[in-house]
């Protein structure tokens, strides 16, 4: 446990609550002190839904600490069962209430005797798991609970090709839009969607899952555990390719083709891939246009969760010719997978969940654009570097009302727009400064954590500000390098001119 004012991944109970509130007619009881119950407010603010968040806090107060929690927790579960008539009630502690080391499984057993709904204790160690790993584990637990209720009497495979989509959840990055695009893509391929879980899914729908021909897991962080469980129990194959970008979408479609042909269908999707790539998606055409060619060789950094950071790095490097200076993720638990995915696509790989370190690495790299989370957007504003948000954690502006998928062929169009609009064009930047445009910023001469060993005097700072923005960072970097090599600790006009001569300009 560490004290921080910014976390890229929330605590474990947030992951459990995301899964519970994604299902239809499932209620969550959170055993927690006041202060841990912010999930309701957060979800109500960010998700544009009309229904109340189905989470009740069973508050740990001084009375509970004095005589134990059992009566209060059991009473709250039974009361919610009577008031809401849910199909399932999920009980979860938080990091704080876990310190009490209470036998919550016993509380659940007692509550189950008095409740019509199923009652589950989220099987999560709150000191070992974060939001993403806890969410995946909770989804797997709920899926396995209802599949085991079938006692081996699994439904027969559907006549027509069908698929389950696992991992679409509340508070996910553009998850609702991605789900709609995935459904459309599968429909184009002649595959019906059997069950989407957990978002909008009833727990009774889980028992229909074995009838699908295969499972789709679009995100590395969530759904893979449930898909692997179904693969073991029912033999269903899974596709864990994220169809983000032209190349990966084509790869995803070919994986669907292979699975269907293996199971007796006769399909051929190469013509569909060709027509979508050349005539429907604008991204392939855009990548060959003069506008996109202006981006070739530009320097960018990418940071986010596993799925989006890896996919965005691949799109920038392979589809748009942008040089990725470094790619990073805060998902340290799956670092080896991430390194294997991006090692050949970028100069360096960063595995860190320390926002200060990320900020310093961005400041040192001085990229033309950042692709990251809400925090990197803040960092970019401080450094006057444009940022495109491509991953959670995110704020309200990345829960758009309009249709903004990142997956499939429409997703490629959205990403192309995001990439192009994230780079500041050199002449535009220069003209804004010449004519006193609204984007004019002060010259930044220090790193994010203000640990620079060099000081710029007033005259040198003014001179640096006169240099056009699209070459200013390079001049600043070369001047500071020259000053360090020549043992100077203060940069003056004379040092700037000497650095210019040394560079052969």
Curated annotation (Swiss-Prot):
Pathway: Porphyrin-containing compound metabolism; chlorophyll biosynthesis (light-independent). Its cofactor is [4Fe-4S] cluster. One of its GO terms (molecular function) is 4 iron, 4 sulfur cluster binding. Disulfide bonds: none annotated. InterPro entries: ChlB/BchB/BchZ, LI-POR_suB-like_C, Nase/OxRdtase_comp1, P-CP_red_C, Protochl_reductB, Protochlorophyllide_Rdtase. Its EC number is 1.3.7.7. Belongs to the ChlB/BchB/BchZ family. HAMAP family: ChlB_BchB (MF_00353). This is Light-independent protochlorophyllide reductase subunit B. It comes from Gloeobacter violaceus (strain ATCC 29082 / PCC 7421). The lineage of its organism: Bacteria, Bacillati, Cyanobacteriota, Cyanophyceae, Gloeobacterales. The gene is chlB.
């Amino acid at each position: 446990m560490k004290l921080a004012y910014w976390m890229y991944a929330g605590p474990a109970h947030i992951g459990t609550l995301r899964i519970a509130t994604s299902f239809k007619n499932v209620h969550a009881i959170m055993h927690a002190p006041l202060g841990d119950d912010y999930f309701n407010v957060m979800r109500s603010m960010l998700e544009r839904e009309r229904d109340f968040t189905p989470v009740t806090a069973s508050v740990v107060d001084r009375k509970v600490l004095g005589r134990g929690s059992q009566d209060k927790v059991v009473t709250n579960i039974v009361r919610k069962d009577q008031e809401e008539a849910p199909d399932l009630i999920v009980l979860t502690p938080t990091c704080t209430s876990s310190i009490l080391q209470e036998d919550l499984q016993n509380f659940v057993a007692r509550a189950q005797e008095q409740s019509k709904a199923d009652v589950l204790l989220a099987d999560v160690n709150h000191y070992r798991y974060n939001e993403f790993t806890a969410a995946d584990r909770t989804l797997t637990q709920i899926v396995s609970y209802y599949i085991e209720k079938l006692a081996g009497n699994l439904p027969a495979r559907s006549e027509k090709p069908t698929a389950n989509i696992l991992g679409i959840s509340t508070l996910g990055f553009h998850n609702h839009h991605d789900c709609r695009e995935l459904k459309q893509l599968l429909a184009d391929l002649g595959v019906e969607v059997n069950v989407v879980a957990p978002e909008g899914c009833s727990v009774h729908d889980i028992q229909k899952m074995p009838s699908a021909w295969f499972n789709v897991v679009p995100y590395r962080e969530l759904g893979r555990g449930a898909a692997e469980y179904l693969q073991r129990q029912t033999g269903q194959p899974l596709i864990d390719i994220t169809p983000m970008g032209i190349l990966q979408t084509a790869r995803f479609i070919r994986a669907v083709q292979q699975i269907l042909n293996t199971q007796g269908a006769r399909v051929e999707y190469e013509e569909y891939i060709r027509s979508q790539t050349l005539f429907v998606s604008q991204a392939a055409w855009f990548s060959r246009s003069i506008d996109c060619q202006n981006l070739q060789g530009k320097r960018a950094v990418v940071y986010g969760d596993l799925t989006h950071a890896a996919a965005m790095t691949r799109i920038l490097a392979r589809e748009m010719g942008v040089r990725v200076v470094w790619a990073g993720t805060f998902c340290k638990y799956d670092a080896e997978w991430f390194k294997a995915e991006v090692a050949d696509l970028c100069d360096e790989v960063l595995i860190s969940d320390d926002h200060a370190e990320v900020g310093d690495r961005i400041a040192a790299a001085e990229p033309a654009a950042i692709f990251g989370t809400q925090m990197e957007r803040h960092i970019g504003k401080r450094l006057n570097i444009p940022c495109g948000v491509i991953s959670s954690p995110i704020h309200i502006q990345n829960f758009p009302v309009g249709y903004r998928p990142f997956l499939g062929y429409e997703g490629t169009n959205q990403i192309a727009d995001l990439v192009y609009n994230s780079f500041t064009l050199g002449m535009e930047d220069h003209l804004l400064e010449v004519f006193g445009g609204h984007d004019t910023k002060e010259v930044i001469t220090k790193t994010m954590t203000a640990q620079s060993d060099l000081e710029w005097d007033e005259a040198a700072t003014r001179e640096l500000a006169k240099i056009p923005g699209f070459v200013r960072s390079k001049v600043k970097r070369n001047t500071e390098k020259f000053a360090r090599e020549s043992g100077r600790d203060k940069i003056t006009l004379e040092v700037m001119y000497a650095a210019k001569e040394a560079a052969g300009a």
